[in-house]
Amino acid sequence: MAKIAVFDSGLGSLSIIKEIQKIMKADIVYFADQKNYPYGTKSQAQMASIIKKTICMLEEKFTPDVIVVASNTPSLMLNLQKGKVIDVKPPLKLAKQKTKSKKIGILATKSSVKSKGLVNYVKENN
């Protein structure tokens, strides 16, 4: 059975965990990073340090097969898709397909809006 670690700074991870449980049986470790709540106010450098430390801690304590960064903010600000780390990002293409106008709005944290990652992600998915 796969060991999956899922984390963010709030409760958003719970919806990700629910979806994982629908598609597979896995031992899931949930880490709510309350110490660094909220992620949305952190600079890119702060976010990089927080995420690196959290991933290392999860690796050391739980040795998961997969680590899911279940927060849009670090997923958009940092390049996280390496090795066993998976991030989550808004499903822009799917959202556009579901609208008649093909125009969508994006709700984002202050840090996400300031980062080039959000702009690049929108360009890539437009």
PLM feature segments, named:
Residues 1-126:
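Non-catalytic structural scaffold of enzyme domains
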